[in-house]
């Protein structure tokens, strides 16, 4: 599989892993404190070929994603679930470099692009998120993680959830479908 866009990753291990799986060029952020030179490089890459932000499914990865989005709001996003980014050995951190070939290819095939302001879009009411147990409640974190995987929008904490759903223009109907699938799967596991 050849990827036309330039993939933005966190480090050289991610680059190595991506290039083992697909033919792609990468830009490495070299950690979460991205310098202006790298941001300029990412901005230029977006103008010429487009970029896909493919960071680790952890706090640092989200911080990097947010920083890049301030400069390149129309960048595409590839997300890995936390469960497929777990290191083989105990003690390591979550990372793109630990994902299987299949997980990387799947994430790149399901790239999502945030949409700019749309006057017709109805933001999902916070109360709806509370009713689904996504904000507050014993299973809120687990539900948000499963929702992020199902909708391919990545994991968010409760404060980020409304913004992320809005950014990708997830409708209340799509949320309901996703939560119905998630709750059905969880019921089948019991």
From Swiss-Prot:
Keywords: Cytoplasm, Endonuclease, Hydrolase, Magnesium, Metal-binding, Nuclease, Ribosome biogenesis, RNA-binding, rRNA processing, rRNA-binding. GO terms for cellular component: cytoplasm. Its EC number is 3.1.26.8. Pfam families: DUF4093, Toprim. GO terms for molecular function: metal ion binding; ribonuclease M5 activity; rRNA binding. It is found in: Cytoplasm. Mg(2+) 2 binds at residues 56, 58. PROSITE patterns: TOPRIM. It is an enzyme of class 3 (hydrolase). This is Ribonuclease M5. It comes from Enterococcus faecalis (strain ATCC 700802 / V583). The gene is rnmV.
